Amino acid sequence: MKLCLTFLLVLMILASVTGEKLSEQTLRRAARKNKGPRCWVGRVHCTYHKDCCPSVCCFKGRCKPQSWGCWSGPT
């Protein structure tokens, strides 16, 4: 029984010394930062609808919400 508890204690100490928890936090932070390209409505100059995010379209050279009435020109 004492040997088992000692073994568990050693494993816990090794996990804290090797920075296992730190690396998990680092991976979580990196995953939060890497969300892919961001699209800005109204700021992006566009020529075609595909130049904008899926939820917006190209309207008069700018990416605008689809509620503005996207024209059915080049996609």
From Swiss-Prot:
Q: Does the keyword Iron-sulfur belong to this entry?
A: no
Detail the disulphide connectivity of this chain as listed in its UniProt entry: 39-53, 46-58, 52-63, 57-70
Q: In which tissues is it expressed?
A: Expressed by the venom duct.
Propeptide positions, renumbered to this chain?
Answer: 20-34
Q: What does this protein do?
A: Iota-conotoxins bind to voltage-gated sodium channels (Nav) and act as agonists by shifting the voltage-dependence of activation to more hyperpolarized levels. Produces general excitatory symptoms.
Q: Which family does it belong to?
A: Belongs to the conotoxin I1 superfamily.
Q: What is this protein called?
A: Iota-conotoxin-like R11.3
